[in-house]
From Swiss-Prot:
Source organism of this protein record: Pseudomonas putida (strain ATCC 47054 / DSM 6125 / CFBP 8728 / NCIMB 11950 / KT2440)
Xref: PANTHER family: 2-OXOADIPATE DIOXYGENASE_DECARBOXYLASE, PTHR39479
Protein name per its UniProtKB record: 2-oxoadipate dioxygenase/decarboxylase
Description of the deletion phenotype: Deletion mutant is unable to grow on either isomer of lysine.
The UniProt record lists the keyword Cell division: no
Keyword Oxidoreductase: yes
Known cofactor(s): Fe(2+)
Binding-site residues, Fe(2+): H70, H226, E294
Enzyme Commission designation: 1.13.11.93
Reactions accelerated catalytically: 2-oxoadipate + O2 = (R)-2-hydroxyglutarate + CO2
Keywords: Dioxygenase, Iron, Oxidoreductase
Length: 464
């Protein structure tokens, strides 16, 4: 088939993201309510803060805002992870970053599947945080063997989805009809299944080891456990959730409120208790807690220097608090966070000059008008000072460093945490994945460099 008959991976991803949102809205009605609240708040922010809308227009994010979301799944075996990577590749999504969640008391390690080029992200920024269960962290050998045997028996992909993945790999793409079929077949992998694959007793054994182990092992597939829309003001969302009948968690995760947001801020409501049917029970008499609602506000992608400062200030806040943030100490935690982060410049020019964040650069109309004039500035700073080049922070496309990932501990209930210490094993994760994960910092640096090259070309300069 001629390549020009193929649907672009970006388009398939956009279709899949829309279909996933529709499915999740039907499965978790509160998600629909959440989308309404996010839309209301985003419209308010853009009406009341024209500078925010202007920045989004410069970067092109204004067009992607309404469709922006991320999902999260957990798979049980290396084979499942490798195949999910092939499935996401059909949609132009690659593994970016390695996250060791064992240090947060969660027996998984993870990556984010997403598009990696700014043009593709502009079409669809959909991303899926994908975790692999670490069976080696189950300290009971009998329970570990039980989990392995249960996982070995399941098939989380439809045969047609596997056929279409292989066809795409073989032929280099999918046509419109096959792409539509692929989206529907791929959705089956992410659906919620009320029928468990274990008995009530087996479920309890897995659950007693860790709730998340039961969530991964006891069901037919890696149901999407949350789908997260992007807001422009997470504090307004946090305040507005109760009026919509959505109880928010005590603390917004990540950095404090800022004029210029950095990295990622997240809040959520606790997981839903859902009825399930265990193998040895008639009807749906059991229950399981897994899926929750989450909202995020994305800010500037930080450089290694910026990340180091972020981690330092966050650690200082945790030490001063003397424990993990919770409902009882939420007010004190937020006050400490705000005070400590006063050290992090809340000004884009200062962040740029100090090398704390990545930026995108744009040739202005003034710059284009002067592109052939003699004596015009030729250095980047000179061009910025003269108004020939405009800059905006590159949006953070990834996830919170685990040091801030309290979402993972809090949304399943306060007793969901176990002690695993830090057991990072990127090599084992990549072996299971069958691919190397990409370095997110290198991707931001490349994106920044491409924008500088585009500016230089537009302004008739050799380089900047």
């Amino acid at each position: 088939m001629p390549a020009n008959d193929f649907v672009s991976p970006d388009s398939i991803r956009a279709q899949f993201s829309a279909a996933m949102s529709l499915m999740y809205k039907q499965e978790v009605p509160l998600y629909g309510t959440l989308l309404e609240l996010v839309s209301e708040i985003n419209q308010q922010v853009m009406a009341q803060q024209p500078e925010v809308a202007e920045a989004l227009r410069w970067t092109g994010e204004i067009e992607r805002l309404d469709q922006e979301r991320h999902g999260a799944i957990r798979v049980g075996t290396a084979e499942e992870l490798a195949t999910i990577a092939r499935l996401f590749a059909v949609m132009g999504m690659q593994p970016v970053g390695y996250y060791d969640l064992s240090s947060a008391g969660v027996p998984v390690h993870s990556t984010a599947f997403r598009a990696v080029h700014e043009q593709s992200l502009h079409v669809s920024p959909f991303r899926v945080f994908t975790s692999l269960l670490r069976l080696e962290l189950i300290d009971n050998p009998q329970l570990r063997e039980l989990a392995q045997s249960i996982l070995a028996k399941r098939q989380i992909f439809t045969s047609r989805a596997l056929e279409l993945i292989a066809q795409c790999e073989r032929e280099g793409g999918l046509d419109a009809a096959d792409a539509e079929t692929f989206v529907q077949e791929a959705l089956h992998t992410f659906r919620w299944h009320q029928d468990a694959t274990v008995t009530a007793e087996q479920y309890q054994q897995l659950h007693d080891q860790h709730r998340l182990i039961a969530d991964v092992v006891a069901f037919k597939g890696p149901h999407i456990n949350h789908l997260t829309p992007r807001t422009l003001d997470i504090d307004a969302i946090q305040l507005g959730m109760p009026a919509k009948g959505i109880p928010p968690k005590a603390v917004v995760e990540g950095p404090p409120t800022r004029r210029h947001p950095i990295l990622l801020r997240q809040t959520s409501f606790k997981a839903l208790q859902e009825t399930v049917a265990f193998r040895d029970q008639q009807g749906r008499e059991g229950s399981h807690t897994a899926r929750f609602g989450e909202i995020e506000q994305r800010g500037a992608a930080l450089t290694p220097k910026g990340r180091q400062l972020y981690d330092k200030l966050l650690d200082a806040t945790r030490v001063a608090l003397g424990g993990a943030p919770a409902e009882a100490n939420a007010e004190r935690y937020m006050a400490l966070l705000q005070a400590n982060f006063a050290e992090f410049p809340d000004d884009l020019a200062q962040m740029r000059e100090q090398g704390l964040a990545y930026f995108r650069y744009f040739a202005t109309e003034k710059g284009l008008a002067a592109r052939d004039q003699e004596g015009r500035p030729t250095t980047l700073q000179g061009l910025i000072d003269a108004g020939h080049v405009h800059f905006e922070a590159l949006v953070y496309e990834d996830f919170l460093p685990v040091s801030a990932a309290g979402i993972f501990q809090s949304n399943l209930g306060d007793d969901a945490q176990a002690e695993y210490g830090s057991n990072a094993n990127r090599e084992a994760f990549e072996a299971a994945l069958g691919l190397q994960v990409q370095d997110e910092l290198a991707l931001y640096a490349q994106s920044e460099r491409r924008s500088l090259q585009a500016c230089a070309q537009a302004l008739n300069l050799g380089s900047m």
